[in-house]
Amino acid sequence: MKVCLLICPKGNDSENLKRIASSCAKGLEENGIQSDILNVSVDTDKRLTLYDYLIFIAEPISSFGKDVTPLLKKFLENAGTVSGKRAATILVGGIRKNATMATLMRIVESEGIILKTSEFISKPGEAKVFASRLNIERNY
Protein backbone atom coordinates (compact mmCIF):
# COMPACT_ATOMS: atom_id res chain seq x y z
CA MET A 1 0.00 0.00 0.00
CA LYS A 2 1.19 3.46 -0.84
CA VAL A 3 -0.33 6.62 0.64
CA CYS A 4 0.14 10.21 -0.47
CA LEU A 5 -0.15 12.99 2.10
CA LEU A 6 -1.05 16.21 0.28
CA ILE A 7 -0.53 19.41 2.22
CA CYS A 8 -2.58 22.38 1.03
CA PRO A 9 -1.16 25.54 2.68
CA LYS A 10 -2.68 28.98 2.33
CA GLY A 11 0.65 30.31 1.04
CA ASN A 12 3.51 28.40 -0.53
CA ASP A 13 4.57 26.73 2.70
CA SER A 14 3.32 25.95 6.20
CA GLU A 15 5.47 24.52 8.98
CA ASN A 16 2.40 23.48 10.98
CA LEU A 17 1.00 21.43 8.08
CA LYS A 18 4.43 19.84 7.53
CA ARG A 19 4.59 18.78 11.20
CA ILE A 20 1.10 17.30 11.04
CA ALA A 21 1.89 15.49 7.76
CA SER A 22 5.09 14.01 9.18
CA SER A 23 3.17 12.84 12.26
CA CYS A 24 0.60 11.20 9.99
CA ALA A 25 3.44 9.50 8.12
CA LYS A 26 4.79 8.13 11.41
CA GLY A 27 1.35 6.80 12.32
CA LEU A 28 1.04 5.09 8.94
CA GLU A 29 4.55 3.68 9.25
CA GLU A 30 3.53 1.96 12.49
CA ASN A 31 1.10 -0.09 10.41
CA GLY A 32 3.70 -0.84 7.73
CA ILE A 33 2.29 1.57 5.16
CA GLN A 34 4.59 3.63 2.92
CA SER A 35 3.77 7.31 2.51
CA ASP A 36 5.00 10.34 0.60
CA ILE A 37 4.38 13.99 1.45
CA LEU A 38 3.59 16.43 -1.38
CA ASN A 39 2.89 20.16 -1.27
CA VAL A 40 0.24 21.15 -3.83
CA SER A 41 1.72 24.67 -4.10
CA VAL A 42 5.26 23.51 -4.89
CA ASP A 43 5.03 19.98 -6.38
CA THR A 44 2.72 20.90 -9.25
CA ASP A 45 4.05 18.32 -11.71
CA LYS A 46 3.57 15.20 -9.53
CA ARG A 47 1.19 12.39 -10.50
CA LEU A 48 -1.07 10.57 -8.04
CA THR A 49 -1.73 7.52 -10.20
CA LEU A 50 0.66 5.30 -8.21
CA TYR A 51 -0.99 5.88 -4.84
CA ASP A 52 -3.74 3.73 -3.33
CA TYR A 53 -4.96 6.24 -0.75
CA LEU A 54 -4.81 10.04 -0.49
CA ILE A 55 -4.84 12.17 2.66
CA PHE A 56 -5.53 15.87 2.16
CA ILE A 57 -4.22 18.13 4.95
CA ALA A 58 -5.49 21.68 4.47
CA GLU A 59 -5.91 24.99 6.24
CA PRO A 60 -8.31 27.83 5.38
CA ILE A 61 -7.00 30.84 3.47
CA SER A 62 -8.16 33.22 6.23
CA SER A 63 -9.34 32.75 9.81
CA PHE A 64 -12.94 33.69 9.06
CA GLY A 65 -13.06 32.35 5.50
CA LYS A 66 -14.34 29.03 4.27
CA ASP A 67 -12.07 28.62 1.24
CA VAL A 68 -8.96 26.50 0.86
CA THR A 69 -6.15 27.18 -1.61
CA PRO A 70 -7.38 27.33 -5.23
CA LEU A 71 -4.19 25.52 -6.27
CA LEU A 72 -5.69 22.25 -4.96
CA LYS A 73 -8.26 22.07 -7.77
CA LYS A 74 -5.60 22.80 -10.41
CA PHE A 75 -3.28 20.22 -8.86
CA LEU A 76 -5.96 17.51 -8.93
CA GLU A 77 -6.88 18.30 -12.55
CA ASN A 78 -3.25 17.71 -13.61
CA ALA A 79 -2.44 14.82 -11.24
CA GLY A 80 -3.25 11.92 -13.53
CA THR A 81 -5.95 9.36 -12.80
CA VAL A 82 -7.45 10.12 -9.40
CA SER A 83 -11.02 9.07 -10.03
CA GLY A 84 -12.05 6.16 -7.82
CA LYS A 85 -9.22 6.60 -5.32
CA ARG A 86 -10.09 6.57 -1.63
CA ALA A 87 -9.20 9.54 0.54
CA ALA A 88 -9.35 11.21 3.93
CA THR A 89 -9.38 14.93 4.67
CA ILE A 90 -7.81 16.71 7.62
CA LEU A 91 -8.55 20.35 8.39
CA VAL A 92 -6.19 22.39 10.55
CA GLY A 93 -7.26 25.68 12.14
CA GLY A 94 -9.85 28.27 11.23
CA ILE A 95 -13.00 29.50 12.93
CA ARG A 96 -15.60 28.30 10.40
CA LYS A 97 -14.37 24.70 10.40
CA ASN A 98 -17.55 23.05 9.14
CA ALA A 99 -17.88 25.42 6.17
CA THR A 100 -14.20 25.02 5.28
CA MET A 101 -14.43 21.23 5.54
CA ALA A 102 -17.48 21.25 3.25
CA THR A 103 -15.52 23.28 0.69
CA LEU A 104 -12.56 20.88 0.91
CA MET A 105 -14.85 17.85 0.53
CA ARG A 106 -16.59 19.40 -2.47
CA ILE A 107 -13.26 20.00 -4.25
CA VAL A 108 -12.01 16.47 -3.53
CA GLU A 109 -15.26 14.73 -4.51
CA SER A 110 -15.64 16.79 -7.71
CA GLU A 111 -12.62 14.93 -9.12
CA GLY A 112 -14.24 11.53 -8.49
CA ILE A 113 -12.29 10.72 -5.34
CA ILE A 114 -14.17 8.61 -2.79
CA LEU A 115 -14.01 10.34 0.57
CA LYS A 116 -13.90 7.82 3.42
CA THR A 117 -13.35 10.00 6.49
CA SER A 118 -12.60 13.52 7.64
CA GLU A 119 -11.18 15.00 10.82
CA PHE A 120 -10.41 18.32 12.50
CA ILE A 121 -6.87 18.19 13.91
CA SER A 122 -4.86 20.84 15.73
CA LYS A 123 -1.81 18.98 17.10
CA PRO A 124 0.73 16.58 15.56
CA GLY A 125 -0.02 13.98 18.26
CA GLU A 126 -3.66 13.84 17.18
CA ALA A 127 -2.55 13.35 13.58
CA LYS A 128 -0.37 10.37 14.49
CA VAL A 129 -3.23 8.66 16.33
CA PHE A 130 -5.66 9.42 13.47
CA ALA A 131 -3.30 7.94 10.87
CA SER A 132 -2.51 4.85 12.92
CA ARG A 133 -6.23 4.07 13.27
CA LEU A 134 -7.04 4.77 9.62
CA ASN A 135 -8.45 1.75 7.82
CA ILE A 136 -6.37 1.57 4.65
CA GLU A 137 -6.68 -1.66 2.74
CA ARG A 138 -7.13 -2.60 -0.87
CA ASN A 139 -10.68 -3.26 -1.96
CA TYR A 140 -10.66 -5.55 -4.96
Predicted regions and their residues:
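FMN-binding flavodoxin-like domain, especially the glycine-rich phosphate-binding loop
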Residues: K2-Y140
